[in-house]
Every structure is written in structure tokens, then in C-alpha cells.
Swiss-Prot record:
It comes from Streptococcus agalactiae serotype III (strain NEM316). ADP-alpha-D-glucose binds at K15. NCBIfam families: glgA, PRK00654.1-1. Keywords: Glycogen biosynthesis, Glycosyltransferase, Transferase. This is Glycogen synthase. Pfam families: Glyco_transf_5, Glycos_transf_1. One of its GO terms (molecular function) is alpha-1,4-glucan glucosyltransferase (UDP-glucose donor) activity. Belongs to the glycosyltransferase 1 family. Bacterial/plant glycogen synthase subfamily.
Length: 476
């Protein structure tokens, strides 16, 4: 099968979040299964700085962005049997960052037009065209309303993945003519209109053959007013083509048996190295060395979305318990201040590291006993999967991808891979922590069984890849 991904970012070239991870991993997994896979993304200045000497200049052409006749440079690099095509235009993409400019609408309108015209130029007409988030959300619409006259494009099937429904691409309706060069009929009849704006994401939901998001529970949640960010009605209307597929993690890179960031390696059948990592981390961060004290790890952005309001509300209570806690991350200033204050008040119990350090993050996953992640909402989440891979049991709010990946401890049969609570409040977070501490302190065999079960879970991209492959095959 010929599959083309079009996205605004992709690891290792340019990455700001989970979308970059997906574009770095999913095409590679599909290629391993024998599919012909290409990725199209912008050629940012940071790509040129890091990879410019490896990338081949292929061709150039011009595209019309409304009245603007714009240069489209095409560069190419093959990596892991995936061919990356980069759209080069220094005016649009040499900004020192990926997103956040006043003219993002024009930048990504240009990118989508260039990507669609590129297919014919490189003679790669995909069976499936997979686009991601609002930056590429107009492609299914353009394919059917602007480029339908190109016969070779008529059999292309489209998949749109929502990584973050919050950013929908809402712009003035004049953009249809001014940038995309199409009439306003689909805006006037309401198809593309939302809150008196042109809404790119709404266009993708209506025009794509399939819509996916990054976990089954989140796919259900975005059909509700609480999580749908205004598009819940459209999601319910198009529910028949909506599904959720959990993202994977790189299980080769994230491996406690080989991780180069760890002082000691370990496996699910021999956890001695995990205990040594705990003692090493305690020493490194100035906490009393004690292999028996339950160590709680947090690696996160410090925001309300990640549940730090309820953590902060119970932090004093938590630190009254016989625990140690290590926090790593940056975010809202008041949360940074709160954790710094409590670290000075409880220096033998709390280490607050208000920074981001990849090496320390890996060491926290490996050393901690409990990984706290009570997000208010979480489309997928990777940290809980990484924690389980390293034998740290997640304590999560049952929402989105957390609900789909963490199996709550069952005290009757010992099943589970972590601990969870349903009602989003500090009280239930605290009650669930007390349960986890009781199991850790009083039932060590049950705890070891939970660790074994967590470390046995397969969250690799190979598993996620099978689900995408089945989805693509349904479209043929």
C-alpha cells in the first residue's frame, strides 16, 4: 500500500510535542511491514541547521497562494526506509520555531497547497493520504473541491488524526479565496463555518474518509460538550467514521535493560537494578537514602491540564505521609513557586526540579515506585506507558488515554498495572494514593505482581501500527 503522511512536524527533524513523535515513529513501523511510505513536512531553519548536509535538493516549482506566486523548493532524505520530502520556502519556514506566528494561517495554507501539488511532481499518488491536526486539515477539502479535476487524485482515500482538538484553525472566511483560491460556497452553506469563522478542523472532519484520535476513550470524550471544544456536535454527527488508536512508545529506546541514561540496568525478572537506581537518585537529589520508602515520581508540564491544581491542594497532606517525592518540569509560575516552597519546607521528602532534563527524567521513571499523573484531560499520554515500562506504577485520573492504558488494581484477584480514580478532585487523588501506599507497604508480593504486569504490557509502535494498517485496509 502507498501511504503519504502530511504534517507540520516530525521527529527527529522538528518536534514540539506528541504529533512529532507520531510522525517520527508510525511511518517507520508501517515501512517495516512492507508498505511504501513517504512523509511531507516543512523545511524549517532548524531542519537545515541539523540535517542540511544530509538532505538532497530534488526540484522546485511554483504554486499560487491566492494572488501570491510562491516558490516551492523540494528536498529529500530517506531514513529507515521512509522517504521524507521537505517543502522549502524561507519566507514561510525560516522563523526559528514551528508555530506561533501571526501569519500561521497563510504559512500552512501554502504548505497544504504545495503538498497536494507535490504528489504529481514526484509521481507518488498514495492509496491513503494521512493528515494531522489543523495545520493540514484543509487537504481533504481541497482534494475534493479544488483538485478533483486531476484524475490521478480521484481514488486517494484520506485519514485525519486529531492530536489536539483545542487548536482548530479558525480564520476569517476571506481566506478561502485569498489563500486557497476557491469560492465561498461551502462557507456560505455552513459546511466550513463555525462561530462565524472558517474552521479548518471542521472541514477535515466532514471531508475525510476516516477520522482518528489518539485513544478510544478520547474519541468518545470529544463527542461531549466537556471535551469537544465546540465541535462535539460535529463529532457526534460523524461518529461512524471516528475511532481512537493509542499512540505507541519507542520500546527499543525506552528499555530499562539498555537505557544509557541509567546508572544501573534491570528487567521485570530482576529488579535489583531498580532499587540501585532509587538509591542513586536519592543521593543525587539530596534525599535520605532509603530503599524501602515509597518514592513518587512526577515528570510533566506544571499546568492545570496535568492536574497540578489538585496535586497542589493535597501536597501538604501527601508530605505528612511516609513518602519521598521527586518532581521534574516547568510550567505555570504559581505551581513552580508552590513546589519550590514545599521542597524548602520538606527537604527530606520533596525534591523539586523546575527545569527539563531528559537524563533526569529517565532516572525518575527508573527509580520511582509510583508515577503520579492525575490529568484533568489526556488525549493519549506517553508518560504513563514509559513509567510502566520501567516498573513504576502509574496513579492516574481515569480519562482519555490514561483510562485506556492503565488497568486499575483489583484487590480481589491482584490484576492491574496501576491505580486510578474517577472523580477529579484532590480528595480522590489522596484516597487513591493511600491505597497505593497500603499495597506497597503491607503487600509486597502483590506490589511485585503489579510491577511484573505493568512491565509485561506491550506499548510499542508495532502494536499501534497494526490498528492503523487495519484502518487503511478498510478504505481500499
Amino acid at each position: 500500500m502507498k501511504i503519504m503522511f502530511v504534517a507540520a512536524e516530525g521527529a527527529p527533524f522538528a518536534k514540539t510535542g506528541g504529533l512529532g513523535d507520531v510522525i517520527g515513529a508510525l511511518p517507520k513501523s508501517l515501512s517495516k511491514k512492507g508498505h511504501d511510505v513517504v512523509v511531507v513536512m516543512p523545511y524549517y531553519d532548524m531542519v537545515d541547521q541539523k540535517f542540511g548536509d544530509q538532505i538532497e535538493n530534488l526540484m522546485y516549482f511554483y504554486t499560487d497562494v491566492g494572488w501570491r506566486h510562491q516558490y516551492v523548493g523540494v528536498k529529500r532524505l530517506s531514513q529507515d526506509n521512509v522517504t521524507f520530502y521537505f517543502i522549502d520556502n524561507q519566507y514561510y519556514f525560516y522563523r526559528g520555531h514551528v508555530y506561533g506566528d501571526w501569519d500561521d494561517g497563510e504559512r500552512f495554507a501554502y504548505f497544504q497547497l504545495a503538498a497536494l501539488e507535490l504528489m504529481e511532481k514526484i509521481n507518488f499518488i498514495p492509496d491513503v493520504l494521512h493528515v494531522h491536526d489543523y495545520h493540514t486539515a484543509m487537504i481533504p477539502f481541497l482534494l475534493k473541491e479544488k483538485y478533483h479535476w486531476i484524475q490521478a487524485y480521484n481514488n486517494i482515500r484520506t485519514v485525519f488524526t486529531i492530536h489536539n482538538i483545542e487548536f482548530q484553525g479558525q480564520f476569517g472566511p476571506e481566506m478561502l479565496g485569498d489563500l486557497f483560491g476557491v469560492g465561498a460556497e461551502r462557507y456560505e452553506d455552513g459546511t466550513l463555518r463555525w462561530n462565524n469563522c472558517l474552521n479548518w478542523m471542521k472541514a477535515a472532519i466532514l471531508y475525510s474518509d476516516r477520522v482518528t484520535t489518539v485513544s478510544p476513550s478520547y474519541a468518545n470524550e470529544i463527542k461531549t460538550p466537556e471535551f469537544g471544544k465546540g465541535l462535539d456536535q460535529i463529532m457526534r454527527m460523524e461518529a461512524g467514521k471516528l475511532s481512537g488508536i493509542v499512540n505507541g512508545i519507542d520500546s527499543d529506546l525506552l528499555n530499562p535493560e539498555t537505557d544509557a541514561f541509567l546508572p544501573y540496568h534491570f528487567s521485570k525478572s530482576n529488579l535489583e537494578g531498580k532499587i540501585k537506581n532509587k538509591l542513586a537518585l536519592q543521593e543525587n537529589l539530596g534525599l535520605p537514602q532509603d530503599k524501602n520508602v515509597p518514592l513518587i515520581g512526577i515528570v510533566s508540564r506544571l499546568t492545570d491540564q496535568k492536574g497540578f491544581d489538585i496535586i497542589a491542594s493535597e501536597l501538604d497532606n501527601m508530605l505528612q505521609q511516609d513518602i519521598q517525592m521527586v518532581i521534574l518540569g516547568t510550567g505555570y509560575h504559581h505551581f513552580e513557586e508552590t513546589f519550590s516552597y514545599f521542597a524548602s519546607r520538606y527537604p527530606e521528602k520533596l525534591s523539586a526540579n523546575i527545569t527539563f532534563d531528559l537524563r533526569l527524567a529517565q532516572q525518575i521513571y527508573a527509580a520511582s515506585d509510583i508515577f503520579m499523573m492525575p490529568s484533568a484531560f489526556e488525549p493519549c499520554g506517553l508518560s504513563q506507558m514509559m513509567a510502566m515500562r520501567y516498573g513504576s506504577l502509574p496513579l492516574v485520573h481515569e480519562v482519555g488515554g490514561l483510562k485506556d492504558t492503565v488497568v486499575a488494581f483489583n484487590q480481589f484477584d491482584g490484576s492491574g498495572t496501576g491505580f486510578s480514580f474517577n472523580h477529579f478532585s484532590g480528595y480522590w487523588l489522596m484516597q487513591t494514593l493511600k491505597l497505593a501506599l497500603e499495597v506497597y507497604n503491607d503487600y509486597p508480593e502483590a506490589w511485585k505482581k503489579l510491577q511484573w504486569q505493568a512491565m509485561s504490557k506491550d506499548f510499542s509502535w508495532d502494536t499501534a501500527c497494526v490498528a492503523y494498517e487495519q484502518l487503511y485496509q478498510q478504505l481500499q
